[in-house]
Amino acid sequence: MVLLLPWLFIILWLENAQAQLEDEGNFYSENVSRILDNLLEGYDNRLRPGFGGAVTEVKTDIYVTSFGPVSDVEMEYTMDVFFRQTWTDERLKFKGPAEILSLNNLMVSKIWTPDTFFRNGKKSIAHNMTTPNKLFRLMQNGTILYTMRLTINADCPMRLVNFPMDGHACPLKFGSYAYPKTEIIYTWKKGPLYSVEVPEESSSLLQYDLIGQTVSSETIKSNTGEYVIMTVYFHLQRKMGYFMIQIYTPCIMTVILSQVSFWINKESVPARTVFGITTVLTMTTLSISARHSLPKVSYATAMDWFIAVCFAFVFSALIEFAAVNYFTNLQSQKAERQAQTAATPPVAKSKASESLQAEIVVHSDSKYHLKKRISSLTLPIVPSSEASKALSRTPILKSTPVSPPLLLPATGGTSKIDQYSRILFPVAFAGFNLVYWIVYLSKDTMEVSSTVE
């Protein structure tokens, strides 16, 4: 029994301590509830803090949890953020056991909150799963921290003159909807450098690199007063990889393929025609597909200029073959006319060839005469030996020599136009590429954002 007494004493002490803790917990919760009830008693959430007196200052900062995607066609972007606002309400000062009271979203509806809205937002969503994603903290000096999780779809004006070597500054503008700057002003809580945080893992962009962000504030005038507008610029630089693979490389290869026809014999009309028509159709298809990922802007982009020049080279190669074929036919016809003009005129038949008739008298033992006429073009066959002797005594007529057929000058081989084109076309295309890439890659294509502090 003596040994059990210490253990009984320890058990009783622990039970007493636990009861004290429970009493303190109940007292703490009852005290906090009493504090909140006292704060809300007579509180009018229709009036801003300092109504009729000092200007209410709302400090803001943004934490981006997900940035993207960015749509070029719609000129908009989407991001998921924690939007934080901090202000001081003198009516909510308290003294109690805790310096900070962490409360749920039910408290938000009972106090005054800023009427912040996004000026260039197309669609914004406040997340409510599984409960409204809102954080509310109240400090003893009346300072309030109010955080919401939002998905914002905002407008991003783009000028695509340098596409696809372009960069854009997509803004996010917000401010008070109803209160002018004489009643509410917005400031950056952590200063202009650290008030907007975008972790590297938050960016989920396929065609862009998020290279940074800048903040600014400005005052705009309207019929209802002057309002303070806070702006965040997200600087995006487009990636070139996709367009190099899908557009630029096929265009360059098509132009090179069109110039292969300069090395094909000019007499191979079907082969060169197929080269020309195929490359022209290919360039047409590439130009159409390149526009699918762009809005229907009224000006030419950098890629449009490149495709247009490539199309001009391909079309010029087809025109070059038409010129070669035309001048080849012209040369052939001219050579034929010259050959006909330079030919020897036909020789007139001599009297001997027309009227000369040889009379051969053949004597035989039967004492009769046989006369036979032969022309100068045929030689008779006389079986008689005496006739052969008589024929041998007859003078031999020489036939008129026949001139050989006329030979036209050869029109095959390589045309001088082809010879010049083999050099001029590749050199001109290489020079164009050199100038094009130097100009656009060395150019600062990032859009300048206004930073009025």
Swiss-Prot record:
Membrane topology per the entry is:
Multi-pass membrane protein
Q: What residue stretch is flagged as signal peptide?
A: 1-19
Name the GO terms of the biological process aspect. Answer: gamma-aminobutyric acid signaling pathway
Query: So where does this one cross the membrane?
Result: 244-264, 271-290, 305-325, 423-443
Annotated positions binding 4-aminobutanoate: 84, 147
Tell me which domain of life the UniProt entry assigns to the organism this sequence originates from.
Eukaryota
Keyword S-adenosyl-L-methionine included in the entry's annotation: no
What are the entry keywords? Answer: Cell membrane, Chloride, Chloride channel, Disulfide bond, Glycoprotein, Ion channel, Ion transport, Ligand-gated ion channel, Membrane, Phosphoprotein, Postsynaptic cell membrane, Receptor, Signal, Synapse, Transmembrane, Transmembrane helix, Transport
Per the record, ranges on the Extracellular side are: 20-243, 291-304, 444-453
| Domain comment (free text) | GABAARs subunits share a common topological structure: a peptide sequence made up of a long extracellular N-terminal, four transmembrane domains, intracellular or cytoplasmic domain located between the third and the fourth transmembrane domains.
Family according to the record? Belongs to the ligand-gated ion channel (TC 1.A.9) family. Gamma-aminobutyric acid receptor (TC 1.A.9.5) subfamily. GABRA6 sub-subfamily.
Q: What is this protein called?
A: Gamma-aminobutyric acid receptor subunit alpha-6
